[in-house]
Amino acid sequence: MSTLARARFLLPLVLLLSACSEAPKTVEKTKAPEKPPEPLTGRQAFQMMYPQARGWAPDAQPVEMRSINLSQVKGEKGKAGAWGAIFVSPALGKSRTYTYSAVEAEGNLHQGVFAGIAEDYAVGRGPSPFLPAALKIDTDQAYDTAAEKSQDYIKKNPDKVISYLLELNKRFPDPTWRVIWGESVSASDYSVFIDATTGMLLEKMH
């Protein structure tokens, strides 16, 4: 076989071998940017914590729930980065605090739902429990109602942090959302009570 004929014979074989030996090209996938942690409304957080409380005690009832503002989570109207709730079990004679947080944070806040240690509880002492079915109004709705009747205060205090407190106040028949301009009741000079069942504005506190 001539040199030219041999080259013509070997060329396809060389090309085939080189094609087989090439490493497959990997397609680089661009990673989608991580979503920032999102705040929740009061009812959303309650619905995360209540099943956990029922798992601890089937007769668990809420006594109080409050918002917890976090620097890591951008707040929105009627929403907070973390929430804390106290549930009681008359059958066990115990109370237990649960928290929901969008992120790991100071103050023993863990991402998701976290249960605290059960403590002694005596029926008739302290705040009264209420039925979960009474919680029909969410915090974003409570905020809208409170803000509508608080425009003068908001104009003078546009950057105030807003907090939320849910409890059964002895002055009102239904549980109430207290919309608080400030980090807490004690640190606030203005708050509004909203009926958590009907959504009605009940009282302004100065």
Locations of the language-model features?
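Sec-dependent bacterial lipoprotein signal peptides
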Residues: M1-S18
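Long, terminal "pre-/pro-" and other extracytoplasmic accessory regions
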Residues: C20-H206
